[in-house]
Amino acid sequence: MLGDGNEGISTIPGFNQIQFEGFCRFIDQGLTEELYKFPKIEDTDQEIEFQLFVETYQLVEPLIKERDAVYESLTYSSELYVSAGLIWKNSRDMQEQTIFIGNIPLMNSLGTSIVNGIYRIVINQILQSPGIYYRSELDHNGISVYTGTIISDWGGRSELEIDRKARIWARVSRKQKISILVLSSAMGLNLREILENVCYPEIFLSFLSDKERKKIGSKENAILEFYQQFACVSGDPVFSESLCKELQKKFFQQRCELGRIGRRNMNRRLNLDIPQNNTFLLPRDILAAADHLIGLKFGMGALDDMNHLKNKRIRSVADLLQDQFGLALVRLENVVRGTICGAIRHKLIPTPQNLVTSTPLTTTYESFFGLHPLSQVLDRTNPLTQIVHGRKLSYLGPGGLTGRTASFRIRDIHPSHYGRICPIDTSEGINVGLIGSLAIHARIGHWGSLESPFYEISERSTGVRMLYLSPGRDEYYMVAAGNSLALNRDIQEEQVVPARYRQEFLTIAWEQVHLRSIFPFQYFSIGASLIPFIEHNDANRALMSSNMQRQAVPLSRSEKCIVGTGLERQAALDSGALAIAEREGRVVYTNTDKILLAGNGDILSIPLVIYQRSNKNTCMHQKLQVPRGKCIKKGQILADGAATVGGELALGKNVLVAYMPWEGYNSEDAVLISERLVYEDIYTSFHIRKYEIQTHVTSQGPEKVTNEIPHLEAHLLRNLDKNGIVMLGSWVETGDILVGKLTPQVVKESSYAPEDRLLRAILGIQVSTSKETCLKLPIGGRGRVIDVRWIQKRGGSSYNPETIRVYISQKREIKVGDKVAGRHGNKGIISKILPRQDMPYLQDGRSVDMVFNPLGVPSRMNVGQIFECSLGLAGSLLDRHYRIAPFDERYEQEASRKLVFSELYEASKQTANPWVFEPEYPGKSRIFDGRTGNPFEQPVIIGKPYILKLIHQVDDKIHGRSSGHYALVTQQPLRGRAKQGGQRVGEMEVWALEGFGVAHILQEMLTYKSDHIRARQEVLGTTIIGGTIPNPEDAPESFRLLVRELRSLALELNHFLVSEKNFQINRKEA
């Protein structure tokens, strides 16, 4: 809870609130809105009428639990039931039944849905808000051309433009444009009504020629002219009803439906008073837009900033789910209409239940969650990742932008983002600036705008009132920046503070301020606000840090950070990783998998997560924190989760670090570490991998799971039980059988081996006709079997095969090639693990755990790591933890440096270690070489920063290939570890080998090991029988491919081979 004095007090909102509120809004409002749109359906003879009674719909609570849905690959959904009636008009009889419409996937309290056993999350999308926008562009003559763009609710665009002669045109496509008079006339106005409803009738009359008068003489002529231009039809089309319907469908419905938000924006921009329920573009809108365009031409009015957030809207999870529900009801309407007609045709008596099927709704939502670009698999690497993922904002997706066409201006930070979209946290690469993150206090308003809270400062009232303002409203206030205001002291009236007014940043006196920010870093996202001393870092490095914190692996023994920002507890609470008491009571029983809580006369069982696999193969595990018999209050923490300690987020470890070069082993961001981190399991993490196999019913019979697998060595089957499935607790190595399976196959007599035929002829022994298709442990999968799941098929259909899943836990210590990072964008790869006696050591004898390169700090400008490093050392010596809000320079100049030095000085006094703070070089100390015992020449910065181990681990990346698959076209090895591929020797690698003069190695690289088919086969034969490998003679396959591709362009390329022996030239055909 945060406050300014005792007046303005606010709590940080729940980090999952955006997603959860959106889903609740869909259930409360969106469902009924779409159900009310469902029309009454009649048969062709209009004898039977079908309709839904929306008032009595109900959602049924799911029968399965979330955890079971994940393990059994099911969808955690609720069944939707609606009352429907079938009315016979002749007899006025009505049959009413409650029918099952379909399943709607539910959202849990963390803002995620479970679809087919997979956690999925729907990302909020930023779109251009429907309405009209005016802008100015220079033509090829350097003259300003003013245009007004009308954007519909579905994203369709139409433009109005004014030329040098003040003529106004409506551009309905890129090439075609028509007069504004023709468009208005086609929409139903005559010339007199047009002139009466505009402010500048003389300008409209000035470009009205005789030809133009003829076009707008009647509505039919105007529609024909409009259709001819819009559809690019040559000749003279004839007016008809079908022509009007086509025009209505292709133009007016797609480009003229403004929607609720568009109507509001249009009324505000053009000062209209058209009712909100009139959501289509009217002739009055067109004429008012044309008047405004003429005003701009003559210097009146203002242009629009398309990138301002007041001109954007958020398409939340509620809107997306409502759109899909409406689409499903349209499909259901078509099904019901066809079923009624079919029943009447076959003289059957229909009932509401017979007419309705649940397939449209269920399949629509399954395809939405599975295929829609804004529905993503939830990233569950660590608790922080889960809550950050749901707060993303994307410009991409249907109706949005693409990574290749978005301009720099759209990607850039805008002043209206203040307090709404984080200026730091975005993705790296092609989508930079297109995928952002919500600021901590931001919320989605009623009209789809992003709102940010402010404290109102009024002379009349002594209290402080909190307001949520949309992007367009806070422009007209003087807003004091929160990073310049103290949290717990009164602001002096004569103080001069930085403020924001109309997208400009000013410095004004305190009495001129209207609003103030409520929190020093309310304009940061969760990831960025977990970075201590972020104000001392370059923004690019802060961006990397906020991304890399989401890649941190939960460690087996987590540790709180000594230096933090204070948001660690809130992040852990909202992540769902903790087990929290839902009510008061007393703990009567505890176990590793559940807690029993007694209170209010009954007992509540709280299950715990035990060695659960995330979709990034990290281990999610809860550790009990309350003893048996303890009295618990509501909201108290019962168990810590993965990467949490004491209810706070704990992604890494506080380790002793020195910034110094060491024999070149930490150059170019490499990191030197001590073996203590390995042997004491400092950076040890557990990873759980899932392996699965299915049993099908083939045309030759069902596949069989058994432990009797012929022709396999016994030690590969040693871990199987009597059913042929690996036993729990077994230690398995690469190549071991996890599930024994035999697939039946038809074998001809001629395909039997001679010894098999002999056994059948003499002894009558039946030789196996099954093929071994066992599940084997792949390379790098060694570990302990912790769980086995046999999911039986439902309904007995061969399309629903049985699935056997085996979960194997791996213990991974830190090793050379793993990636580690700090919280300031300082990342590196482990280059060498030194014995602890060889590491540099301090004056008290402690050896350093990590050695970083000091050259990685000044050029990257992330000095915050130095402050954290030194303050962490003081905290470890004083046994203190610090929670520091960013921008502490609001209290005084050099506040961060003074805090660090004062804490180091105090630590030096209390521990009687003068080397902790030496006035000649504060923060540095003289340390000693562990190999020689001699001190290093220069004092070195030492400290205890918080270092994370990232998920980019060498065990998942290391790869070697001796033989493997080849591409069919180029005959070169495939690419990638998953395909057992090889490394490409490119042009620069060839130059390097040429520079060393290694001709034979270079020839091997370009022929045997690459795409020379004949040479590859000769190598294999020569290796088996022995002898010298012959040199390849003809051209490799890639050259032959080039010749064939040139032939497709009608270019013939002849090539010749020159013999090494007699220099004879032989022509070769490709």
From Swiss-Prot:
- Transmembrane segments in this chain: where? none
Catalytic activities: RNA(n) + a ribonucleoside 5'-triphosphate = RNA(n+1) + diphosphate
Does Transcription regulation count among this protein's keywords?
no
Q: Which GO terms describe its molecular function?
A: DNA binding; DNA-directed RNA polymerase activity; ribonucleoside binding
What's in the keyword line of the UniProt record? Chloroplast, DNA-directed RNA polymerase, Nucleotidyltransferase, Plastid, Transcription, Transferase
One biological-process term from Gene Ontology? DNA-templated transcription
| The EC number(s) this enzyme carries | 2.7.7.6
Sorted alphabetically, the Gene Ontology cellular component annotations on this record are:
chloroplast; DNA-directed RNA polymerase complex; mitochondrion
Q: What class of enzyme is it?
A: transferase
- InterPro entries from the xrefs? DNA-dir_RNA_pol_bsu_ext_1_sf (IPR042107), DNA-dir_RNA_pol_su2 (IPR015712), DNA-dir_RNAP_su2_dom (IPR007120), DNA-dir_RNAP_su2_hyb_sf (IPR037033), RNA_pol_bsu_bac (IPR010243), RNA_pol_bsu_CS (IPR007121), RNA_pol_Rpb2_2 (IPR007642), RNA_pol_Rpb2_2_sf (IPR037034)
Against Pfam families, the record matches this protein to: RNA_pol_Rpb2_2, RNA_pol_Rpb2_3, RNA_pol_Rpb2_6, RNA_pol_Rpb2_7
| Compartments in which it is found | Plastid, Chloroplast
State the similarity comment: Belongs to the RNA polymerase beta chain family.
Assembly, in brief, is: In plastids the minimal PEP RNA polymerase catalytic core is composed of four subunits: alpha, beta, beta', and beta''. When a (nuclear-encoded) sigma factor is associated with the core the holoenzyme is formed, which can initiate transcription.
What this protein is reported to do is described as: DNA-dependent RNA polymerase catalyzes the transcription of DNA into RNA using the four ribonucleoside triphosphates as substrates.
Write the protein's name: DNA-directed RNA polymerase subunit beta
Whose protein is this, by species?
A: Atropa belladonna (Belladonna)
